Amino acid sequence: MSHVVFEAQGPVALITLDRPERRNAVHRPMADALREAFVRFEADEALRVAVLHGAGGHFCAGADLTAVADPLLRNELDPEGGPRAPMGPTRMPLAKP
């Protein structure tokens, strides 16, 4: 199950953090899905701006500390071979707002 919802509304990408039971705290699967949402946004020439928001009355509680504490998830590499950002797209250079 993805915890990130991507919707295109005209030139706007609406990216929703959808893990309200954890106040949208980011764990590895959500970080990967969030990164993919921004890769998708960046690649689509019809989309001009992205709006990131949270479901369930919360924006984001930050990193899910239970998941981040797992030593097996530290020092992972992303698919391009660089360091994996714990929050998904935090280290991605984006050309669009």
Model-assigned labels for residue ranges:
Residues 1-55, 69-71:
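Conserved CoA-thioester-binding segment of acyl-CoA-metabolizing enzymes
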Residues 33-35, 39, 49, 65-97:
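An acidic, glycine-rich surface segment that forms the CoA-thioester-binding/catalytic face
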Residues 57-61, 66:
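Short, active-site-adjacent cap segments at secondary-structure transitions
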